[in-house]
Amino acid sequence: MRITTMLARVRSACIQGIDAALVSVEVDVASGLPAFNMVGLPDTAIRESRDRVRSAIKNSGFTFPMERITVNLAPADLRKEGAGFDLPIALGLLAATGLIKGERLKQFLFLGELSLDGEIRPIRGVLPMALACRREGIAGLILAPGNAPEASVVDGLAVIPVATLSQAVEFLCGEREIDPVTADPAALLAHDPGDEVDFADVRGQSHAKRALEIAAAGGHNVIMVGPPGAGKTMLARRLPTILPPLSLNEAIEVSTIWSVAGLVPSDRGLVTVRPFRAPHHTTSDAGLIGGGSVPHPGEVSLAHMGVLFLDELPEFPLNVLEALRQPLEDGEIVVARASGSSAFPARFQLVGAANPCRRGCPTLEACVCTPGERQRYLSRLSRPLLDRIDLHLELPAVSYSDLSQGPQGEPSATIRARVLAARRIQTERFAKTKVRTNAQMGEKLIRRFCQIPAEGQRLLALAMERLGLSARGHDRIL
């Protein structure tokens, strides 16, 4: 029997930074000349959904109402973007024309882009939307099968995958049974896929490996200066293999950022290893820090809880390098736009690498650069930026004797065990604070835990005088 109501409400969501806000999709079908109007600050992709929704409804075997249609995305003052409103708009139209009961729609939140034949396509940002769905007490989430693994990591939420618009209608009308998709995030984290690289592969550079172990234990930033082929990139790529595994909360936090960027692994739905990001030195400040007309996370946020490796550090534009100062200090980046500001987490370990000179000469003796050229090249790294990097390493060229020998170093698993032991000590030390690693200590904690004898104080005073260290540099040394 046809339901006479001509107004329907369907719940959906949109991304705001790395969080999600609920959106009520209100669909009104009234008599009058055929029209399809959309209000509520939709972006171009949402406005274009009129044609996608019309074709999807017709090609799914349903009748598209030839009446005056108004779609409102509430709240109206919230900017919306993306094609994820296609499915709720289509279902709202079918409900307004009496095909679906409105009471059934109230039980779920709907997300998905529609193709012209009615197929439901995955969208990005599903994980924060699923978290918002649970937070608001909504029982279930209906979305594309490609997004189901990602949403299923949210406990206490019925995730219903539907492949087409007609399947969604059949499910809502009680004509089709679809089992919810479930996942065990703890089991996903416990499954160790194994590292493709290992510290045992590194020949020589024992002092650099020791420094990276200290950096991993305390969460310190590192810069390595050495000739090409010294192993800077090789060492940096192996740093994540000795970092502690992600906890469940950390994995969900990282996965939320990656979900907004559309990078969550489709087979697991959860980022289970610490990120390693290595952007090219031609990256713009928006690409590194984040930005856009609607702010999106940059490389510093994608490296959250992991490693950000910047090779050829002096080759990066100066404005990009200086933009690193806020996330290195605060652990987050705030992107401000006229419509508002968004805060993205950016608690990463920076590993920078640089050649001693622009030409990349193998040794100082063989270098054809003048002392002034070498100084100008490295002086592109400002003092405020260098003050935020705890460990400065000079790497020599790898000798033939080191290369000719087989792997002699410790495997990553052995080093990681020592790192985990050091992290446990820090956890006990900072139990009553928000600090988790030595690198995060502020001035008060440094004064409390980093007491040095008189001889060490004299040496530090001499270093500050001769090297011109700042107060921040003083604290970093301690």
Enumerate the language-model features and the residues they cover:
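Walker A/P-loop
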Residues: 223-268, 330
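Catalytic P-loop NTPase motifs of RecA-like helicase/translocase cores
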Residues: 117, 310-317, 360
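Basic, amphipathic alpha-helical bundle interface domains used for macromolecular binding and assembly
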Residues: 45-50, 65, 72-82, 295, ...
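The Walker A (P-loop) glycine that initiates the GxxxxGKT/S ATP-binding motif of P-loop NTPases
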Residues: 226, 290, 312
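Walker B catalytic acidic pair
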Residues: 305, 311-313, 323
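Long, charged amphipathic helices and adjacent flexible linkers at domain junctions
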Residues: 175-199, 264-278, 419, 432-433
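Peripheral, non-AAA+ core regions of ATP-driven protein-machinery
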Residues: 1-223, 227-230, 336
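Conserved alpha-helical scaffold flanking the Walker A/P-loop in AAA+ ATPase domains
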Residues: 213, 269-275, 283-308, 340-341
